[in-house]
Curated annotation (Swiss-Prot):
The keyword Transmembrane applies. This is Sulfite exporter TauE/SafE family protein 2. It is found in: Membrane. It is a multi-pass membrane protein. Belongs to the 4-toluene sulfonate uptake permease (TSUP) (TC 2.A.102) family. The keyword Transmembrane helix applies. Keywords: Membrane, Transmembrane, Transmembrane helix, Transport.
Length: 458
């Protein structure tokens, strides 16, 4: 009886197993589908395995020019997208939209190197804090990220003639402001050099001893400054909030975490949710007393410090202007892949922020906006991602080289205005190259009879 009972139990288990197996997928199906959709949507390995651009002479020349452009642009922390786009279009022979997506990757690579270096550099004029002004970054970043989203859509909708015209107008204004600020800082530095020389002649041995006693006290006063991890965490939360919106929305093919119709009502509803998100973060930061910090040190009183104090007080009274400018900068960054630093940098210089702090803060903000722009290009079906990553590595190395050279020059000659002039030179070259190429592109469209009006984003 026992021998007959064992086969009956085994046959019952075998019969029951398929029914259990059929029930398990019904329980795990929603979770499995969500995980599969997320993994397939974020599976960039297939994009990186796309056929790369052939290694030709023009590609090598484009890489060398990109290295030179990144090393120059890294001094001002502006990203260099205004130079990358003409290089990739004129030299490498890419179309404007592909060049813009490449530029977003290249700006990201250079910004990573910039931020990595500036995080460990202390500003002696602000009590030993980092060169990056996290208060300004908090105030500007939400609107800049919203502008990037708008700019990417505008890149698909606007005709080439309108994009070229807007770029030329805004960049011309920024260039004039930058060179004006550069001349101002140059004259101010010249006056400070004369003051130091006159003081050096009048100093006697007793004053030298007093100064030698003061310096250790200053160093001890600056040491307790700690890294603002909370502010950095808030910036990361802001970035992740916008990234979550992009994951929910999906790309133009309707591929995302949730299944929605491409360019349907749900698509635009999720996209428009960035507006209240931006308003929430911006208003909270604007009216929060915690975002204000005293940047000046009581031990550094000079003509330049008085001017900076006066300018910073005016900037705080008109701080609502910063989000508007950040929005415009983000729009241009999304359209051209320039990171937005070319407009933010003249703004910060205009209100009296030191060139070193301006460059460091701009590179930090450009990192956030350029990574968001690069991710959006990926989600919109960007091609040749592997080649774009190679150019990003080139810009990363070039930025490290450029930063070291500029820091050595500033330390030796004491001319921080070199940073401002480098920004102006990059802007001027960008205007000439981008406007010339854009005008030729518009002329070719006109001669060939192509459609030169607005297009649908999808």
């Amino acid at each position: 009886m026992r021998n007959n009972f064992v086969p009956i139990i085994l046959s019952f288990i075998i019969f029951l197993t398929p029914s259990i197996a059929e029930q398990e997928p019904s329980i795990l199906s929603p979770v499995d589908q969500l995980l599969n959709k997320t993994s397939s949507y974020l599976d960039f390995s297939t994009k990186f395995n796309q056929p790369r651009i052939e290694l030709t002479t023009s590609t090598i020349i484009a890489g060398l020019l990109s290295f030179l452009a990144s090393s120059i642009s890294s001094a001002g922390g502006i990203g260099g997208g205004g130079l990358y786009v003409p290089i990739m279009t004129i030299v490498a022979g890419l179309d404007l939209k592909t060049a813009s997506s490449f530029s977003a990757f290249m700006v990201t690579g250079g910004s990573i190197a910039n931020v990595g270096c500036n995080l460990f550099v202390r500003n002696p004029k602000s009590g030993g804090k980092t060169l990056i002004d996290f208060d300004l970054a908090l105030l500007l970043e939400p609107c800049m990220l919203l502008g990037v989203s708008i700019g990417v859509i505008c890149n698909l909708v606007f005709p080439n003639w309108l994009i070229t015209s807007l770029f030329a107008v805004f960049l011309a204004w920024s260039t004039l402001k930058t060179f004006g600020n550069g001349l101002y800082y140059w004259r101010l530095e010249s006056e400070m050099v004369k003051i130091r020389e006159s003081n050096r002649i009048e100093e006697d041995d007793e004053e030298d001893k007093i100064e030698s006693l003061k310096l250790p006290l200053l160093e001890d006063y600056q040491r307790p400054k700690r890294f603002p991890w909370i502010k950095l965490g808030v910036l990361v939360i802001i970035w992740l909030s916008y990234f979550a919106v992009y994951l929910l929305r999906g790309n133009k093919y309707g591929e995302g975490i949730i299944s929605i119709e491409p360019c349907g009502n749900a698509y635009w509803l999720i996209s428009s949710s960035q507006i209240p998100l931006t308003l929430f973060f911006t208003l909270w930061i604007c009216f929060s007393d915690n975002v204000q910090s005293q940047q000046q040190s009581d031990y550094h009183v000079s003509v330049k410090d008085v001017e900076d104090l006066r300018s910073n007080d005016g900037a705080r009274s008109n701080k609502c202007m910063f989000p508007v400018m950040a929005l415009l900068a983000g729009v241009l960054g999304g359209v051209f892949g320039i990171g937005g630093g070319m407009l933010i940098s003249p703004l910060l210089l205009q209100v009296g922020i030191a060139p070193e702090v301006t460059a460091a803060t701009c590179s930090f903000m450009v990192l956030f906006s350029s990574t968001m722009s690069a991710i959006q290009y990926l989600l919109l079906g960007m091609e040749h991602t592997g080649t774009a990553s190679i150019f990003a590595v080139i810009c990363f190395v070039a930025s490290l080289v450029g930063l070291k050279v500029v820091q050595k020059v500033i330390t030796e000659y004491g001319r921080a205005s070199i940073i401002v002039f480098s920004v102006g030179i990059v802007m001027a070259l960008s205007i000439v190259l981008m406007t010339s190429y854009g005008a030729l592109d518009v002329w070719n469209d006109y001669v060939s009879g192509r459609y030169m009006g607005f297009k649908l984003p999808c």
